[in-house]
Amino acid sequence: MSNSNIDNDPAKIDSLLKKAKSKKIPVTYDDINKALPLNKNPSIRQLEEAILKFSDAGVDILESNEDDEIKLDIGMDEEFKLSTNVDNESEDEVEEENIGSTDDPVRLYLKDMGGVDLLTRENEVEIAKRIEEGRKTMTASLCRSPIAMRCFIVWYEDLVNEKMLLRDLIDLEANMLHDEVHENDEEHNSETEVEEHEDNHLSMSRVETQILHNIIDRMKKISFICEELLIEAKKCYEESFEPKVLQNSKKYNNNLELLINEVSEIHFNSKRTEEILGKMYGINRDLINKETAFLKLAEKYGVTRQNFLDEYIGSVINAAWKEKMLKNKKVAWKELITKESDYIDQMINELSVIESNTGLLVNDFKKLVNTIQKSERQTLQAKKDMIEANLRLVISIAKKYANRGLQFLDLIQEGNIGLMKAVDKFEYRRGYKFSTYATWWIRQAITRAIADQARTIRIPVHMIETINKILRTSRQMLNELGYEPTATEIANRLSMPLDKVRKVMKIAKEPISLENPVGDDSDGGQLGDFIEDKNAVAPIDAAIQSNLREVTTRVLATLTPREERVLRMRFGIGMNTDHTLEEVGQQFKVTRERIRQIESKALRKLQHPIRSKKLNSFRNGGKRGDGNPSDLLEA
């Protein structure tokens, strides 16, 4: 069957969509591919727009399944069958088509992305609550750890003593941009965003100055609470060593609640959180290694794994536990404790050191780490769900920034980074949809990347901002004046030094590749072919010099060998340099005067019309204009 009527039929996608919606059945990626032009591979833009069209309409897009034979009765061509069996094609052709469809990374990305359902407003709120719950649990758990308390105290001291920058402690971007995201038209001019984006970036330092004192005051309060908690915890463990005593302490619980509330109000830098988690996870790994080694040792003495866990888990491993296990009814335990007494004593000491470093009993510390890890997994999974459901939004925004200096995949990657930031900072209680909030962050990430990476010669972002400001002013003045403004006029309008304006306008010029084609024809050549090489010898000059050498050689050959040799040495003809009368005299073992006489005689011979007329054309050509025949020989 001919495909000529299908290739250019713009209604095929709409017809497929209409039938799928009316019959409430899904489509596959093969169906979409078949509905696109078949005379050539569909472009990324066509495929992406088709997938977004079906997704926005609520039609499910399924993976291709060779066992399914679901068909749509649309009364048109067989091309709309959802069956993956392709008629009238050889197996080799089918295999080549499948390979081609999975080779393109963009197509693979779009295919995987299309398999994730879009979120409703309720779904977004539900996921946001999961993220919030995970964060609350993690914050509360971290605040219960003396390790975190000590970190808070150190951070405050470093901040006050100017050993740490504020941006290294908190997420400045979240504090600065939190109130700047408003509902705006998605068709906002993307070029204007690129120009205005840097103003926000440059204000980061101003925001740091503005909120520094507020953060210092808050960290001072956190540091004071942590010191109170550490003192009370130390006192409790020294006196009773019973966790329940501390848990029942009203003062301790009140201070702990205050600490959790204060820490929750600060958006700490992710590196700071990772610093605390890294310390706790490192100690936990050390504990697991020690327990694993102890378990293997116990199994050698016949202690079963389950019995070991029953006796070990939940117990405080100390001298009292050792005495208790000596009285155990199981012979294996008695043998283990008796023969490995030194090993167990060493382990008890090591666990005691860990308890001292963590400020918690080993069992309490392990429970705390498990709670943190569980909340971290919960938060990461919720973020993953939110990100995957909004990948289409990134593509729809990235399309608007095509041909701006970055490839489409790079735009998607940068947009995805912005999407992840949006997920981290989204607050569902403000009432706006996540897509509205995320759009700003995605655009911000893409425009930042374009400003930072698009140019062949990288220019700092602050200079990009100045360039955009001058270009924007230049366009405004062009509309007002009717002609291109001069650098002086722009400098006066912006109250900027003239030298700086000229420098910026010079920097603003985009470099051009020497391999750019010239003309519409394939034989037009490249731009580099038309650039003058000032060091290269012109072809006509090279031809003249070559001819001059040949004529000079023939003319000198009419002299005696001695005269020819003297002239060549004196004027450097065919040699690297010329020679003095004394140097030539030493060569011929005669005096300087004799060489001068030979030279004069040879030059008089060259002035004879028979010889000189052969050289006159070179002299008249203006290469050597003083008329001296000897000058003509210097070539």
Curated annotation (Swiss-Prot):
GO terms for biological process: DNA-templated transcription initiation. InterPro entries: RNA_pol_sigma-70_dom, RNA_pol_sigma70, RNA_pol_sigma70_r1_2, RNA_pol_sigma70_r2, RNA_pol_sigma70_r3, RNA_pol_sigma70_r4, RNA_pol_sigma_70_non-ess, RNA_pol_sigma_70_r1_1. Residues 182-202, 610-635 are annotated as: Disordered. NCBIfam families: PRK05658.1, RpoD_Cterm, sigma70-ECF. Residues 182-191 have a biased composition (Basic and acidic residues). The gene is rpoD. Residues 465-542 are annotated as: Sigma-70 factor domain-3. Its main location: cytoplasm. The keyword Cytoplasm applies. This is RNA polymerase sigma factor RpoD. The keyword Transcription applies. Residues 581-600 bind DNA. Sigma factors are initiation factors that promote the attachment of RNA polymerase to specific initiation sites and are then released. This sigma factor is the primary sigma factor during exponential growth. Residues 555-608 are annotated as: Sigma-70 factor domain-4. Belongs to the sigma-70 factor family. RpoD/SigA subfamily. Interacts transiently with the RNA polymerase catalytic core. It comes from Rickettsia prowazekii (strain Madrid E).
